[in-house]
Amino acid sequence: LDDKNTVTSQGVFYGVVGLLGLHALSWVLAHSIANTNLDSYADMLENYAWGQKFAWGSAKHPPFFAWVTGIWFSIFPTVDTAYYLLSFLNVTLGLLGVYRLAQALGLSSLALPAALLLRMAFPYSTLAAKFNANSILLSLWPWVAVAWWYSVREAGRSGWLWSVALGLLSAVAMLSKYYSGVFLLGIFLVAWVSHEGRHWFVTPKPWLALLVFGLGLLPHLQWLQAHDLVTLRYISEQGGDSGTDWRQVFKFALAPMAYWLLPWLLSAWLVAPGQPSFMQRLTGWPQRLVRCWLPQGWDDTLFWLAMLPWLITLVFGATGFVQLSLPWAIPVGFGFSLLWLRNLAAAPADVSQIAPRLRRWMIGWCILVVLVSPWYAWYQAKQGATHFYVPRREAATELLKGWEERQPDLRLRWVGGAWAENALLAFYGDASIQVVPGVPDQFPASVSPLADWHQQGGMLLCPLGPLDKPVQTDCPQQMQAWLQAHGQSSEPIHLTVASQGWRFPKRIGFAYVVFDYVPIRP
C-alpha cells in the first residue's frame, strides 16, 4: 500500500511539473515570437555583464542573481530565447514552492489550484520575462516559507535539517535583493501569532538557522566592508529624504488587486460553495471577492504569511522610510491564491471540483498566449515600435567588424560607455569581451576593477537612439574627455545600423558613436 501511495504521489508531482512546465514553455515561445529584444531598460544585459565575474557584491545589488545568470550562460548560448527559458524556469520553481507550501500547511487539496491560479498573475507571466533582482525572489520566497514552516513543525534530525535549509535559503534571498529583509521580518512576526511558532523561539532551531544565515552572508559583508559599503550607499539613495511619495504609496497599495487581478476574479467566480446557479454566482461574486482577503482570527498564520510583505512595505513607504517602487510588489503575492482558496472553500470538495476545469483553462490559456504572440509582433512592427526595431544583434556584428578593420592586430578585450546597453557587444557578439560601466578607472567600474585594462584594446560605446528621434545624452562628450585625459585619440566613429529580416518591414536606422582605446606602446 505504501509503495502504491508513493507511486501515486510521484505521478501527481510529475503531472504538476508537466503543467507548470507547459506554462513556462508557452511563455518562452510567446516572448521569443513577440519580442525582438530583451527588456528596454537593459536590466537583463546588466545581469549578464555582472555575471561575467564571480564577485560578492556590486555597486548596485547583491550578487546572487548575477551568479545565476553567469552560470546559466556558461552552459547555454547567449540568445534571447535562452534568457527567457531562465526567466520562466525561475517562475516554475516558484510555483512548485507554492505547491509545496500548501502541502506543508495541510492544504494539499488547494495546492494545484493555487499554483495554477498564480500562473495567470502578471508577475508570473508577462512581467516574469525580465529576469532580475525582483523576479528571482519569485522562486526564493516560497521555499524560504516552506523551510520555516518545517523548521517550526518538525522535530529531531528533520527539524535540524530544515533549520539549516531556512538559514541557507534566507541568506540566498538576501544575496538576491536586500528587499528580502522585509519578507524575513514578516516571517519573524508570523512566528509569534501561533503557539507552535512562539515555542519555536525557545528551541535551538531558530538560532541554528540564524547562525547558518550569518555564515552565508559573511563573505558579502566582508566584501561590503572592503568596498566602503558601496551597495548600502546605493540603497540609502532610495530612501525617503524628500518625504512620503503618496502617489507611489497609493499605487503600491493597489498592487495586489492590479498584479493579481485575473486570478483573484477567477478564484472568486469559480469557488462558490453549494453549486449555485449563474445568477446566484454572479450576485455573490462581490462578497466573495472581499472574503478572499479576510483573516480567520489573529492567529491566522496563512493570512499573515501572505499579507505581511505587502503590509510592511506599505508602512515603510507611508512613513517615508523608503521611496516605493512598484516592481517591488512582484514577489509579494506568492501566498495570495492559497489564501483566497482557503477563505472561499467551505470544504475541500469545493476546490477539488474546480481543479480539472482550471487544468483545461490553463492549457487553453497557454495555447492562446502562443497564438496571440505573432499578432503582437506584427502590431509592433507595423507601428514602428522603437524597442522592437532596436538593432542590438546587428550593432554587435557591425561594431566587431569595424574594430577588426581598424585594429587588425589588436584584440578587443573590453567595452565601456553607456551602461548597460554596452553589454550588447558581449552578449550578442563576443562573450570574451569584458563589460565595464562607464570607463574602467572610475566609479562604478572601480568597485570591481578590470585588471590591466590600460594594456588591452577597448571600445567605448554610446547608443544615440533612432535617427529620427535621437536620445539626449552626454555620453560622447564624457568619453571624449576621458580619452583626452589618457592621451588617446577622441575622434568619434559614427555608425548607423538597422534591424534586418522579414520581421522588420520598416527600415529604422539607429545611431551609435564609438571610440577606440588603443594601448600606448613604449
Enumerate the language-model features and the residues they cover.
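Short helix- or helix-capping micro-motifs
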Residues: 114-122, 170, 174, 188
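Membrane-proximal, lumen/periplasm-facing interface regions of secretory-pathway glyco-
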Residues: 37, 321-329, 352-411, 418-434, ...
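Membrane-interface alpha helices of multi-pass inner-membrane proteins
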Residues: 53, 160-177, 189, 212-215
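Transmembrane-helix signature of polytopic, membrane-embedded enzymes
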Residues: 16, 98-120, 139
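Specific aromatic-rich, kink-prone transmembrane helix
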Residues: 95-97, 136-155, 162-170, 336-339
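Transmembrane-lumen/periplasm boundary regions of multi-pass, lipid-linked membrane glycan transferases
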Residues: 172, 184-297, 302, 309-314, ...
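Short acidic/glycine- and proline-prone juxtamembrane loop motifs at membrane-interface regions
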Residues: 126-137
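Transmembrane-helix motifs of polytopic, lipid-linked glycan transferases
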Residues: 85-106, 143-147
